[in-house]
Amino acid sequence: MTAAVWSYPKSGAGEEETIFNMVNAILLRIHQSGHLAEITDVQKGLVKEALDYYKTIRGNIRQAYPYWPIGTSSYSDNWSALALDAGKKHYVAVWRRGGEDRITLPMTRLAGKEVKIRCAYPQERPVTFGWNAAESSLSVRMEEEICARLFEVEVVSDEK
C-alpha cells in the first residue's frame, strides 16, 4: 500500500489558492478529488497543468530523497520549503503564507554544481527567482501573501 496526499481544489477558490493546493500534492502521490465539475475553467487548467507535470516526474519521485532547505516548518511559519533530490533533478516546492515577500533557500546539496532552474508549476504565473552559485542558494520572491510555486533544478554539470 502506498500513501498519498489528497488534492481537493475548491469551487470558487482563486487561482493562487488552487495553485497552493496542487503544490501541496505534486511532490508526493496525488489522490485527486473535489467537485471538479464545479470549478472554473481557469482552475481546471491549473489542475490539468499540475497533473500533466506530475506525470512527467512521478518516476523520479519514487527514488528521490526529501530534504527541507529551511528546516521543517511549523504551522505558524510564513515560509515552508520541501525539496526532493532525484540525482540530476531536484524538485523544490515553496510556500508563502505571509511575512516578507522574498526568501533565500540554502541548497547546499547543489554546492559546486552548475544548475539550470525553472518554475515548473505553474509556468505562466508571476514569480521572481534567481540562483546564487557562490552561496548555493535559490532566492524566491512571490508577491501574493498566500501562494506557492514548484521549481525544477537540473544539474547540468557536477563542476562549475
PLM feature segments, named:
Residues 124, 136, 158-159:
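Non-catalytic accessory/interaction domains
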Residues 1-127, 139-142, 148-152:
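Active-site-proximal substrate-binding groove within the catalytic cores of carbohydrate-active enzymes
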Residues 127-133:
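Extracellular/luminal ectodomains and secreted, surface-exposed scaffolds of diverse proteins
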Residues 143, 155-160:
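Mature N-terminal, pre-catalytic/accessory segment of carbohydrate-active enzymes
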